[in-house]
UniProtKB/Swiss-Prot annotation:
The active site is at residue 88. Pathway: tRNA modification; archaeosine-tRNA biosynthesis. The gene is tgtA. Gene3D superfamilies: ArcTGT, C1 domain, ArcTGT, C2 domain, PUA domain, Queuine tRNA-ribosyltransferase-like. It comes from Methanococcus maripaludis (strain DSM 14266 / JCM 13030 / NBRC 101832 / S2 / LL). PANTHER family: QUEUINE TRNA-RIBOSYLTRANSFERASE. The keyword Metal-binding applies. SUPFAM superfamilies: Pre-PUA domain (SSF88802), PUA domain-like (SSF88697), tRNA-guanine transglycosylase (SSF51713). Its cofactor is Zn(2+). Transmembrane segments: none annotated. InterPro entries: ArchSynthase1/Queuine_TRR, ArcTGT_C1_sf, PUA, PUA-like_sf, PUA_sf, TGT-like_sf, TGT_C2, TGT_C2_sf. It comes from the Archaea. One of its GO terms (molecular function) is pentosyltransferase activity. This is tRNA-guanine(15) transglycosylase.
Length: 649
C-alpha cells in the first residue's frame, strides 16, 4: 500500500506499507551481501540507517550453507535485518553471465519460502546496445515470466509482494509497451531495469527518457524503483522524474576502490590524503583526517570509507525529502545537474516531456521560484502559466514592456490607469504577465538574476504567437492611450471597480471559467488588509466568498464561495465525486480517502481547490486535493483531499 504525504515536481514523499512495516519514500536500499562474512558495513549500522534493504536470493539459493539458514530461519535472520527485505532474483547474474541455474517459478517459490517481504521476478535484463529484435524478444519472454509469476503467487496463496521490472533496452516505445503491459498486472512495485550500463557510460539523457517513458504508462499508485542507481548525484533528478526507491551497492564497491562519494561526484582517497580535513561531517570524516584514513590497513580503510559513502547517500536522500516538503526540489535538481555536463543533458531533455510533468507538479509551493539558469525557463510553473493565460476571457488587451529595474508585482510599482483593459507586461521568464493576476504564484513569488541577452529573447516567439492569436483584441499604444483617457472621463458610477475586475480575472486564471458575471460584479465588494493594504477578501452581502491566501494570492473559497463555484463551473470541473457511504463524513469536514473516490475532473493538479460532490453533483464539501486527476482514479489508499469545510443538510 502506497500513499503520498507531500510532493514537488514528480517527486513523492510517501509511505509504503508492506507486511505491517512502513517505508518512507524516497529512500535508498543498501545492497546487503547474503553472506555476513562478505558484508562490508556492519548490520548494526545498516539497521539504524535503513528502513529497507535489498539482497540477492539467487546467491542465497545457489550457496548451500546460506540456503540452509534462509530456509530454516528466514532471510531476515540470515542477514540480521528486522525491517523490509527485498530480494533480486538472479537477473543481474543473468545479465552478466548469460545464464542462471534456477527457473522463474523456482525463484518465486524460494523467495516466498525464506520470508522475503518483496520478491522479484526473473526478468530478462536487456542492455542498451542490443538490436531491436533482441530487445523485443527479451521483452516477450519477460511478459510471459511476469504473468506466470503473478499467477503462481495467486494460486499458491503467497504473501510476498512482487517487483515487476520494466525492460525494453534504449527503445523508448518498448519501454512504454513494457510499462503498459506490466502495469496491468498486479505487481506491488515497478523497478525500471537495465539502466546501469547507461549510468556507467554517463548516458544520463537516455536514463531520463527511459524513466519518463516508463512513468507515463505505469500506474500512479505504485512505487517506482530505479534499479542499480546508487550514486547520490543522480537521486535528485531521478526523484523529480518520479522514482521512489533506489538501491546502492556503490557505497561498498566504491570503497573497495578507494573512492569517496559526495553528493555531486566522486573523489579518490589517494588524491585527498594531503588535505587537512574531509568535506564532510559524518562520524568517519570527523574522527579521521584524509591521511589517517588513507594509511589504515586495507580492510579497515574499506569499511570506514564504505560507512562514509553510506552516510552521504542517506544524507542526500534526507536533503531531497526536505526539498520536497519545502517546495524547492527543482532548485536542488538544477544544482545537482550542474555537477557534470552529461547530467545537465539529462535535465535539458525533460523539456520535451513538460506536458506530462506539469500534471504532477503542485500549483502552489511554500518556496518561491528561484531562477538558477537557462534550464529554469522550462520548469512546469512557467509551462503551466503560459497554458493558463488562455483561461482569461479577454475583451481588450494592451501588451507593454517595462524597465528591467521594475520590482514585482508590477501592478504595485506601475502607474496603471484602472480600466477594463487587460494590460500584459512582457516578462523575460514568464513570457507575459497580466497586471490583474500578477500577485499570484509564481508571478510575484520569484527571484531572477540579471539575464543574458539570449535569455531575454527566449520568450519572444511565445509573445508573438500570443499577439497573433489575440490580434483582434490587442490595442496599439495610440488606441490604448485614447481609450484610457476616454475611460478616465467617465462618471465614477459608470466605472468598473478595479479590485473586483482584478479578482474576476484571478478567478478565471485559477478556475478556468468566468465566475463573476456582470450582475455579481455589481453586488460583490472587496476588503483590503489594514496592515498591508492588499486585497484580502471578496464578499457578498457581508459574507466572505473568497480569501486571497497571503503566500500565493490564490483565491480560497469559503462556504458561499464553494457554492458559487459549484454553480458556475460545469461538471466535472474542479470536482471530486465520492461514494455515498462517506457523504456524511465529507459534510462533517473529514478528509476524503482515495478508495472512496468514484470520479473527478481529469485535469486536476496537485493542491488545487476542489468541490466534493456525490453522484448527483450535490455539493457536500470543499477543500484541497493532494492528488492529480489521474491519481485520484488510480489510488486506493491514503488521503486524496483535505477539507476546509462541509455543507450540513
Amino acid at each position: 500500500m502506497f500513499e503520498i504525504k507531500a510532493r514537488d515536481a514528480m517527486g513523492r514523499l510517501g509511505s509504503i506499507t508492506i507486511n505491517g512495516k512502513k517505508i518512507e519514500t524516497p529512500t535508498i536500499m543498501p545492497v546487503i551481501h547474503p553472506n555476513p562474512k562478505k558484508q562490508t558495513v556492519s548490520m548494526d549500522l545498516i539497521n539504524k540507517m535503513a528502513d529497507v534493504v535489498i539482497t540477492n536470493s539467487y546467491i542465497t539459493y545457489t550457496t548451500p550453507e546460506l540456503r540452509e539458514i534462509a530456509e530454516t530461519k528466514g532471510i531476515h535472520e540470515l542477514i540480521d535485518f528486522k525491517n523490509v527485505v527485498v530480494t533480486d532474483s538472479g537477473s543481474f547474474q543473468l545479465s552478466v553471465y548469460g545464464d542462471v541455474n534456477v527457473g522463474p517459478m523456482e525463484i518465486i517459490d524460494f523467495q516466498e519460502k525464506i520470508g522475503v517481504d518483496v520478491g522479484t521476478i526473473l526478468d530478462i535484463p536487456t542492455g542498451p546496445d542490443v538490436s531491436r529484435e533482441k530487445a523485443e524478444s527479451d521483452l516477450i519472454e519477460t511478459f510471459k515470466r511476469a504473468e506466470d509469476s503473478i499467477k503462481r503467487r495467486k494460486e499458491m496463496g503467497y504473501k510476498l509482494a512482487l517487483n515487476g521490472t520494466i525492460q525494453g533496452s534504449k527503445y523508448l516505445d518498448l519501454r512504454q509497451k513494457s510499462a503498459e503491459v506490466m502495469g496491468k498486472m498486479d505487481f506491488d512495485i515497478y523497478p525500471i531495469g537495465a539502466v546501469v550500463p547507461l549510468m556507467e557510460d554517463y548516458r544520463y539523457r537516455e536514463v531520463a527518457e527511459v524513466i519518463l517513458n516508463s512513468k507515463m504508462h505505469l500506474p500512479t499508485n505504485k512505487p517506482v524503483h530505479l534499479f542499480g542507481c546508487g550514486h547520490p548525484m543522480l537521486f535528485a533528478l531521478s526523484v523529480a522524474l518520479g522514482c521512489d526507491l533506489f538501491d546502492s551497492a556503490a557505497y561498498a564497491l566504491y570503497a573497495k576502490n578507494g573512492r569517496y562519494l559526495t553528493a555531486d561526484g566522486t573523489l579518490h582517497l589517494k588524491d585527498m590524503k594531503d588535505l587537512k580535513s574531509f568535506p564532510c561531517t559524518c562520524k568517519v570524516c570527523s574522527e579521521y583526517t584524509p591521511k589517517q584514513l588513507y594509511n589504515l590497513e586495507e580492510k579497515e580503510k574499506t569499511r570506514l570509507l564504505a560507512e562514509h559513502n553510506l552516510y552521504v547517500t542517506f544524507e542526500e536522500i534526507d536533503r531531497i525529502k526536505n526539498a520536497i516538503k519545502e517546495g524547492n526540489l527543482w532548485e536542488l535538481v538544477e544544482e545537482r545537474c550542474r555537477s557534470h555536463p552529461k547530467l545537465l543533458n539529462g535535465l535539458r531533455v525533460i523539456s520535451k516531456y513538460m506536458d506530462f510533468i506539469e500534471k504532477h507538479d503542485p500549483v502552489s509551493k511554500k518556496s518561491g521560484f528561484f531562477y538558477t539558469g537557462y534550464e529554469s525557463m522550462n520548469r512546469p510553473e512557467i509551462y503551466r502559466h503560459k497554458q493558463r493565460l488562455d483561461r482569461i476571457q479577454y475583451d481588450k488587451i494592451y501588451v507593454t514592456s517595462v524597465s528591467e529595474n521594475t520590482s514585482k508585482p508590477y501592478s504595485e510599482n506601475l502607474s496603471n490607469v484602472p480600466c477594463d483593459v487587460d494590460v500584459l507586461v512582457k516578462d523575460s521568464v514568464f513570457g507575459l504577465v497580466p497586471l490583474n493576476i500578477d500577485t499570484m504564484y509564481p508571478l510575484a513569488q520569484n527571484e531572477v538574476p540579471d539575464l543574458y541577452d539570449f535569455e531575454k529573447k527566449y520568450n519572444n516567439e511565445f509573445v508573438s504567437e500570443f499577439n497573433e492569436k489575440h490580434a483582434e483584441k490587442i490595442l496599439d499604444i495610440s488606441t490604448y492611450n485614447y481609450y484610457i483617457n476616454h475611460y478616465g472621463k467617465k462618471k465614477e458610477c459608470d466605472k468598473i471597480n478595479p479590485d473586483i475586475f482584478r479578482i474576476g480575472k484571478m478567478l478565471e486564471y485559477q478556475y478556468g471559467a468566468k465566475i463573476l458575471d456582470e450582475e455579481l460584479m455589481e453586488k460583490v465588494k472587496s476588503r483590503r488588509s489594514k496592515n498591508t493594504g492588499r486585497i484580502r477578501n471578496l464578499l457578498l452581502e457581508k459574507e466572505v466568498l473568497f480569501t486571497l491566501r497571503a503566500n500565493d494570492n490564490f483565491l480560497i473559497p469559503a462556504k458561499s464561495g464553494a457554492e458559487l463555484l459549484h454553480e458556475k463551473l460545469e461538471f466535472p470541473k474542479y470536482r471530486i465525486v465520492i461514494d455515498s457511504s462517506v457523504e456524511e463524513f465529507a459534510r462533517a469536514g473529514k478528509s476524503v480517502y482515495s478508495k472512496f473516490v468514484k470520479d473527478c475532473d481529469p485535469e486536476l493538479r496537485p493542491f488545487e481547490e476542489v468541490l466534493i460532490v456525490n453522484s448527483d453533483d450535490e455539493l457536500l464539501a470543499y477543500g484541497t486535493t493532494i492528488l492529480n486527476g489521474r491519481e485520484l482514479m488510480e489510488f486506493d489508499y491514503g488521503v486524496a483531499a483535505t477539507l476546509r469545510g462541509g455543507l450540513k443538510k
